[in-house]
Amino acid sequence: MYTKNLNSLEINEDYQYSRPIIKKPFRHITLTVPSSDIASFNEIFYLEPQYVAQALRLTNTFQAAIDPLTLNFDFEKALQIANGLPNAGITGTLNQSVIQQTIEISVMISQIKEIIRNVLGLVINSTNFWNSVLAAITNTFTNLEPQVDENWIVWRNLSATHTSYYYKILFSIQNEDTGAFMAVLPIAFEITVDVQKQQLLFITIRDSARYEVKMKALTVVQLLDSYNAPIIDVFNVHNYGLYQSNHPNHHILQNLNLNKIKG
């Protein structure tokens, strides 16, 4: 069994629109499902229920990018996987150190949120999605005690003065901003902090410490599985708001070189 955080989009029931419409109140669902696979990512889905299977399939595909010896995220392997996905393309990548300083954790969280916004490579207007991103980043650096034994966190070098760990998140998003596509963003953090582990487990966003943070991430977009789409979408994906020429993601996805389906 493992847990998924699902942000469920509620759909316009009279189908006057073919794209997902978010209605208030917004529903955040934590779902625990049986699984024969070990999830190495903290998985956060923001999508319509009929696309959960596609998101799970993509998540499981990127499990192959986890090095079985170190349990770290193999960035080159992830690129190879992304380039082999059918009807998919890459909109952003990152593989570098992003923090090397003494910093208040709340400030670091805000900086990393903007880094994720950039590596996503798409304009996502949903406040709820970005609140989920902010919560996930916050849990990468704080609230660690309840997560201490989770598969997405790997404790490495521990000493009286330092702690190093890996933390892996995977976001899946599908809404009116992504149109006929789903975007998947696996992220791996390599974190070293000048704090002993037992203290780190209870660190808060108002605390400061010296951090070294490296991020490995890439964003893959894939065409939605047509058999899960409303009939109107199967025959006319241009009904999605994304295909309005003034939508900020229109040219990004329109000009994307999608991987071909191998025959």
From Swiss-Prot:
This is Type-2Bb cytolytic delta-endotoxin. The keyword Ribonucleoprotein does not apply. Active after proteolytic processing. Pfam families: Bac_thur_toxin (PF01338). GO terms for molecular function: toxin activity. SUPFAM superfamilies: CytB endotoxin-like. Keywords: Sporulation, Toxin, Virulence. GO terms for biological process: sporulation resulting in formation of a cellular spore. Belongs to the cyt1/cyt2 endotoxin family. InterPro entries: CytB_endotoxin-like_sf (IPR035918), Endotoxin_CytB (IPR001615). Gene3D superfamilies: Delta-endotoxin CytB-like. Kills the larvae of dipteran insects by making pores in the epithelial cell membrane of the insect midgut. It comes from Bacillus thuringiensis subsp. jegathesan. GO terms for cellular component: extracellular region. It comes from the Bacteria. The keyword Phosphoprotein does not apply.
